[in-house]
């Protein structure tokens, strides 16, 4: 690289000025939501970005169009130009690209380490918690953007208003989803940390010990400087339990009477949520939030608490929430279609933990009480299905019709008795509903064609490839005749 080229890049690379020796950053598994977001921000910083994945998707297409070099399949030659290799915990250490990088003394770092470098020179706002991270990150981003603060953001899902899951902004603010699934959020050193809730999930990371998980969240909060800010949902019993152990300034939020930022008078009409937020020494805010569910009202209140501390104008908060389009695959309304047997509404949701499924069902019931709720559920990971088996059974029999797919393994080995067929059998045995087991996504459309009725709300639910199924059903407009032909 010439001296002139180095000077040009120095002008562009404002986020991590000390990374001047880094030219090419390679991402193993670049098509994932978390990886692609960081890659896109660094691409906009002027770095040469390369990455590999097993197959093309909308993310890899977008990155390629922006100038990234994309490889399909994993091989040692992919890292020849790399100054550093970024990996997620989903990538096996025996991956040939990781092996080649280590043999050639190319640094191999985790995704969160690179995110931490992006955050190091910025006012970082990290959003953590078992549930609600993606939506809360999107809501906070929307408010800051509406206020003209032009934040950089890196989210685990699509921010619909922005049309992307990551963007390089011009201000000092960086808003990012903080992932506890592999404890890698401990690399982050933000100025503000949100904790939405804490439940048992990803327990393999924590040796099956919930106390270890709780301590990890405390350690995450103590990564804040002494002048930093923790924003914590006091409605969550585990978060409330941990409050006395947090030695940083804390703002609490929730429906609880003792919350510093309190949500009251909640009601839902269709997809919109209406509620009032009370803040100490500030005017109450009467909110219209353009997404359904009490859980999303809580997510919005977290974002309001953060924005209020930054003295964001109330008008910007109100406008941002009214115009919020949601996050990708979070109660994502794909349309209402004439099926050939009346009209039906199609909604897609990423929730894959019993608590997430439960609040999604409640939001659907509250907004569309007159509709029959038909859920197509795909369990995610055998270990999660095993660990939360009874909780899944308790939640899933609250729909009117349940179509159960088999487990999306996410690379795990099958566990006896922790699959879709077994879960289906357990729910049937309770006598409340009679679920239908469909072993593959390919076999589902003709089954659905025989189930769908006038006025149904069809809800595809899960973190696996059931999201692709939702898009397929939308492309067919839920047409019964088309779906039958796929049988």
Swiss-Prot record:
It comes from the Bacteria. It is found in: Cytoplasm. One of its GO terms (cellular component) is cytoplasm. Pathway: Cell wall biogenesis; peptidoglycan biosynthesis. Gene3D superfamilies: Mur ligase, C-terminal domain, Mur-like, catalytic domain, NAD(P)-binding Rossmann-like Domain. It catalyses: UDP-N-acetyl-alpha-D-muramate + L-alanine + ATP = UDP-N-acetyl-alpha-D-muramoyl-L-alanine + ADP + phosphate + H(+). InterPro entries: Mur-like_cat_sf, Mur_ligase_C, Mur_ligase_C_dom_sf, Mur_ligase_cen, Mur_ligase_N, MurCDEF_pg_biosynth, UDP-N-AcMur_Ala_ligase_MurC. Pfam families: Mur_ligase (PF01225), Mur_ligase_C (PF02875), Mur_ligase_M (PF08245). Its EC number is 6.3.2.8. ATP binds at residues 129-135. Keywords: ATP-binding, Cell cycle, Cell division, Cell shape, Cell wall biogenesis/degradation, Cytoplasm, Ligase, Nucleotide-binding, Peptidoglycan synthesis. GO terms for molecular function: ATP binding; UDP-N-acetylmuramate-L-alanine ligase activity. GO terms for biological process: cell division; cell wall organization; peptidoglycan biosynthetic process; regulation of cell shape. Belongs to the MurCDEF family. Cell wall formation. PANTHER family: UDP-N-ACETYLMURAMATE--L-ALANINE LIGASE, UDP-N-ACETYLMURAMATE--L-ALANINE LIGASE-RELATED. This is UDP-N-acetylmuramate--L-alanine ligase. The gene is murC.
């Amino acid at each position: 690289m010439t001296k002139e080229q180095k000077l040009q890049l120095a002008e562009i690379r404002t986020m991590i000025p000390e990374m001047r020796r880094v030219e090419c950053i390679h991402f193993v598994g670049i098509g994932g939501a978390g990886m692609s977001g960081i890659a896109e921000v660094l691409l906009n910083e002027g770095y040469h970005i390369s990455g590999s994945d097993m197959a093309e998707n909308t993310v890899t297409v977008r990155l390629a169009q922006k100038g990234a070099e994309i490889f399909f399949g994993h091989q040692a030659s992919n890292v020849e130009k790399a100054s550093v290799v970024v990996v997620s915990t989903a990538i096996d250490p025996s991956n040939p690209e990781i092996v080649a990088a280590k043999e050639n003394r190319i640094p191999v770092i985790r995704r969160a380490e690179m995110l931490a470098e992006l955050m190091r020179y910025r006012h970082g706002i990290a959003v953590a918690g078992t549930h609600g991270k993606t939506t809360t990150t999107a809501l906070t981003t929307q408010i800051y953007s509406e206020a003209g603060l032009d934040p950089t953001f890196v989210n685990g899902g699509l921010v619909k208003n922005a049309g992307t899951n990551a963007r390089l902004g011009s201000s000092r603010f960086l808003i990012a989803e903080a992932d506890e699934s592999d404890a890698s959020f401990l690399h982050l050193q933000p100025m503000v940390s949100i904790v939405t809730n804490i439940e048992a999930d990803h327990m393999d990371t924590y040796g099956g010990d919930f106390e270890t998980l709780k301590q990890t969240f405390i350690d995450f909060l103590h990564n804040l400087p002494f002048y930093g800010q923790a924003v914590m949902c006091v409605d969550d019993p585990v978060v409330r339990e941990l409050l006395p152990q947090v030695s940083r300034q804390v703002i609490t939020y929730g429906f609880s009477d003792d919350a510093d930022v309190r949500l009251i008078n909640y009601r839902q009409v269709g997809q919109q949520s209406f509620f009032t937020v009370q803040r100490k020494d500030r005017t109450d805010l009467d909110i219209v939030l353009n997404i359904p569910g009490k859980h999303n009202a809580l997510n919005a209140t977290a974002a309001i608490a953060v924005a209020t501390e930054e003295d964001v104008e109330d008008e910007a908060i109100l406008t941002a929430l009214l115009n919020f389009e949601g996050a990708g695959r979070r109660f994502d309304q794909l349309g209402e279609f004439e099926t050939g047997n009346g009209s039906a509404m199609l909604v897609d949701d990423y929730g894959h933990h019993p608590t997430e499924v439960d609040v999604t069902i409640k939001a659907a019931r509250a907004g569309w009480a007159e509709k029959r709720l038909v859920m197509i559920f795909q369990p995610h990971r055998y270990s999660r299905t095993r660990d939360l088996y009874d909780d899944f059974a308790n939640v899933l029999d609250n729909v009117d019709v349940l179509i159960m797919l088999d487990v999306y393994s996410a690379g795990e080995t099958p566990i006896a008795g922790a699959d879709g067929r077994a879960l289906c059998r357990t729910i049937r045995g309770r006598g409340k509903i009679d679920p239908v087991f469909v072993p593959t996504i390919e076999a589902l459309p003709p089954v659905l064609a025989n189930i769908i009725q006038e006025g149904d709300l069809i809800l595809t639910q899960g973190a696996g490839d059931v999201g692709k199924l939702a898009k397929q059903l939308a492309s067919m407009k839920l047409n019964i005749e088309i779906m039958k032909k796929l049988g």
